[in-house]
Amino acid sequence: AGRDAMIFPTMWSPFKIASFTYVFSGSSDEKFMRHCKEDPDSVSAGVQAIADTLEDWAEGFLDAGADGLYYSGQFSEPGRFSQKEWETLVMPSDLQILNRVHARKEKYNIVHICGEAEHNFTASPERYKKYPGDLFNWDVHRDHFTLEQGREYFGKPVLGGLDNHGILIHGSAEDIAGETRRIIGSFGKKGLMIGADCTVPADIDVNRLRAAVMAAREV
């Protein structure tokens, strides 16, 4: 990794990539979900094959000098799966990859808990308590799970606080700086990495992000 910044490649979960094989071949997420319910064993076999490949991919990232993974945990949106279904279908492949990183000395897992647009960007952070994450990130504005709650629940540092559908996009630089100061003032500096709740647009004005960075440095 570089001297000035740590490197965390993004990796989507095997389950999400399995869904992509449907969507990008002209099928749909709805059909994938139907197959998960009707024939979970076949879906699990396919997801396992993807997980085995991604596990090797993750190892390659680490060997090349990455400091860990920014891992996008998926499919915990309310209404997709029951807790039992999720633990059977989704969780094992997540843990396969995250445990591989966790076993490496001085390598770290950033666990991003992602909700998709068709589910109003909501997810279920409470399902990730047993994940070997070193830093946790979720949508505090839509999951109704605050940074303070996350710090206590996970017992780990947390990332986020800035609404990637709100102030980061529509606010002024002064608004963003003010919100950054408010978050840090409320939460404190310990165990917090200020950031967005989820992905920001690729064409975002970098000065918006800079406003948050500079405000955080000044607190």
What do these predicted ranges mean?
Residues A1-V219:
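Active-site loop segments of alpha/beta catalytic cores
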